[in-house]
Amino acid sequence: MCMIPLSKLSEEKYARIICYPKYEREELTKRLCEMRRLGIKALCFVGDKKIGEVSVLGKGYVGIVVSAYTEKGKAALKIRRTDADRKTMKHEAEMLQIANSVNVGPRLLGFTQDLLLMEFIEGLLLPAWIKKIIEERDAVKRVRRVLRDILEQCRRLDEAGLDHGELSKAPKHVIVDRGDKAWILDFETASTMRRASNVTSICQFLFLKGRMAELISGIIGQAPQDDLLLLLKKYKRSPTRENFEKILEACALTGLNC
């Protein structure tokens, strides 16, 4: 079920996605107007998640993500839930703009009160990507390069003063595309008001604890835990490039020509 033009989105099964979880006719009309303002011509209901009988790309506490089509092509559209803990998508849009300014995250294409339109990223979540390539001959090199890319992006977010907020548990927040480029997603809880700790948070997820750290250590070897903890504490006190390079070295992510 794909490429549904805006004129057909008033059908109940689609309307209940656009106004999830509480459908109201007036709210649907408002949101369809917002879609037109963003230049959206149609939505495409595909993905691994389901709401009723309709497939979607993602479902979270703040919004539902679906594929959208504009005159410029395919995009990702995040639709604010009617029961979300916020009244507008403005904050997330502003946080994504800051991330974009340091070449992190999908490109922001536009937003309204209830909608966030972004560049569509075709790829796999990091854990699934690693499991897919794990038996390939160049798996070690590819995994190391992607991990280095992720840490460099987190470093740029730290320098920008933007804390993502959810990278210590990030299985759903990093996608790897077909060109082995990593993309950090979901800036809904990001903030410039708290201390940015993206490098330390992502290192906990990738190298220090949990299934992801176990998966990675089985491919590239285990980072020295005590040494890495000390280096992360040092970086937290003084987030210099020199201290960051020491973290890369401890995680076996240097000498990759990235």
Identify the meaning behind each predicted range:
Residues V104-R148:
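Conserved structural core of kinase catalytic domains
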Residues E152-D163:
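Protein kinase catalytic-loop region centered on the HRD/HxD motif
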Residues K78-T112, R145, L206:
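A conserved alpha-helical element in kinase catalytic cores
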Residues A170-V176:
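Hydrophobic residue at the +6 position relative to the catalytic HRD Asp in the kinase catalytic loop
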Residues S67-E71, F120, V176-R178:
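Active-site beta-strand termini and strand-to-loop segments that position acidic
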Residues G39-H91:
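ATP-binding glycine-rich loop module of kinase domains
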Residues D177-C258:
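C-lobe/activation-segment region of protein kinase-like
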Residues M1-V54, L248-A252:
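Juxta-kinase regulatory segment immediately upstream of eukaryotic protein kinase catalytic domains
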